[in-house]
């Protein structure tokens, strides 16, 4: 999609590209490695592209929602042959994720942030959605990694190990 519109945006010397990332674009999520990897990749792609196209008046932003009340848990695929050795931790994480999604914000909140990114006079590169994601973003940057790790494991109900 991006490649299809970039030529026109360059010609008109303006445009906005908004990608939907996730808090797991900058925070790990156990047992969700492939999803996390795709969101980490989107973060890198969006930031790199922003630097490449800014000279043409084009801005690239990434929206970073946290837990949002969608059907993502029901629509996610579980490995075809999950290893039993990971079953206990995987089940705890999936339960924690499902409960957090149920308590999460609505997709409307994310849509409002997308609208802000599209219409802002001074678009930002990143738009964390909600106070929890903003807090986690700051914590990830400034807290000691051991403290962040303990909090993450607690959030996902994993043993402190």
What is the predicted function of each stretch?
Residues 8-9, 27, 48-58:
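Active-site-adjacent segment of SDR/Rossmann-fold oxidoreductases
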Residues 126-139:
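Short-chain dehydrogenase/reductase
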Residues 55-124:
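SDR active-site lid
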Residues 2, 38:
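Active-site helix of classical SDR
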Residues 19:
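Rossmann-fold scaffold of SDR-type NAD(P)-dependent oxidoreductases
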Residues 22:
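Residue(s) in the substrate-gating loop at a strand-loop-helix junction
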């Amino acid at each position: 999609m991006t490649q299809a519109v970039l030529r026109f945006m360059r010609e008109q010397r303006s445009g906005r590209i908004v990608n939907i990332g996730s808090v797991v674009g900058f925070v790990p999520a156990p047992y969700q490695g492939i999803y996390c990897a795709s969101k980490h990749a989107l973060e890198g792609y969006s930031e790199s592209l922003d630097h490449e196209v800014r000279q043409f008046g084009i801005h690239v932003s990434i929206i970073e929602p946290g837990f949002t009340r969608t059907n993502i848990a029901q629509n996610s695929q579980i490995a075809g042959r999950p290893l039993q050795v990971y079953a206990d931790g995987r089940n705890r994480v999936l339960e924690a994720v499902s409960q957090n999604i149920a308590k999460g914000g609505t997709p409307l909140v994310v849509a409002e942030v997308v609208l802000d990114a599209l219409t802002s006079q001074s678009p930002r590169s990143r738009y964390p959605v909600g106070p929890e994601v903003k807090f986690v973003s700051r914590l990830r940057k400034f807290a000691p990694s051991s403290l962040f790790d303990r909090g993450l494991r607690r959030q996902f109900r994993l043993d402190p190990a």
